[in-house]
Amino acid sequence: MSEEPEPAAGTFRAEARDWLRAHVPAGPHPSVDTAEGFEWHRAWERELAAARLSVVSWPAAYGGRDVSLLDWLAFEDEYYAAAAPVRVGQNGIFLLGPTLLGHGSSEQQARLLPPMARADEIWAQAWSEPDAGSDLAAIRARAERADGGWLLSGTKTWSSRAAFADKAFGLFRCDPQAQRHRGLIYLMFSLRADGVTVRPIRQLGGGTGFAEIFLDEVFVPDADVIGEPGDGWRIAMSTAGHERGLSLRSPGRFTAAAERLTGLWRRTAGAADTAGAACTTGPAGTAGLAGPAGAAGTAGPVGGAGPAGTATADRVADAWIAARAYRLHTYGTAARLAAGGTLGAEASLGKVFWSELDVALHETALDLLGPQAEIAGLDGPDGRWLGGYLFALAGPIYAGTNEIQRTVIAERLLGLPR
């Protein structure tokens, strides 16, 4: 298929591009991991919602535009190209929202999706526990039957957005006698409810994007159960498919980063090679990489003339090519889904690819910057690479470790024995 499918290259893309150019605030943007920054991003989400651009692929009744999956990818391309703010509502918009559309009741959809789209309710994930991370089926937090609902007890950890979010969704054990993949229930609950304690987790960069959630007999009504008790695992795997596959890691994120990386290479290393550099042109008219053809034996910055410079230029090129390859893969997956296909174990393949690509992009950028990256400050243009690198390191761990994903690939895609 072509890199830019026709449905994703029409008037909607142009409309989104024009709106984003007119409305995206100049950077640097506040950190989403502080109370003030969190509310700043909530206000941005509300601006998107007012333009009906916060959940473009959702039904119009819930604040969306009913656009195709390919048009959604086009919007994501433009969003990242415009250097727009981080989506503070991503857990709801990209994970819980699609889960409710696929498995929730009509009452739940009507009650929960509109405030989610407007950022009136921002959601946290409540999956991992101190003794159950990628092995999600090992969870111990329990849901016990009560009159009209359930009582939740236990601990969740590494809950993204939980420090400042309004509500959370997650998996709990409702039948301790059942096999570990059974007896699970998918529940939603308020982080302001009686019995809930949230303790922020400070990260490498100083932010608190994750938190622990302590639950002490927290009441959740039956209306906030997704699906049936005992069927939680199947529904959770639907959510995980969105996290590992299309929804959280749209290709626009990586193509935009790859373009920034090539620009950084020209600004730092490429400057040393100006006298002898040859410029090539990349696919679809995109500017390619300047060749590292400096004077032999001349010392220069990382990536400059000589063998070391050639190696760095190769890494930049490899990352750029990988970002384009992921883009093609994702558009292909979207076309297959649009034709009635499903997102299965291949989501694990995509998760391994994008998480390792993210690390490669940021590692290469830091090598180009050298010590400057450590003193630039996280809020500056070069500091974005350091902050991005610290977060990218978690990519092979969250959403199911890459070791787990490779096991899924081996068993379910390749048919290898356990």
Which stretches of residues belong to each language-model region?
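A structural signal for short hydrophobic beta-strand segments in well-ordered beta-sheet cores
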Residues: 141-144
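C-terminal helix-coil-helix/basic helical segment that borders enzyme active sites and/or dimer interfaces
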Residues: 28-35, 324-380
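A short, Trp-centered hydrophobic/proline-enriched beta-strand micro-motif
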Residues: 119-127, 171
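Internal helix-loop-helix
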Residues: 49-110, 114, 118-120, 161-167, ...
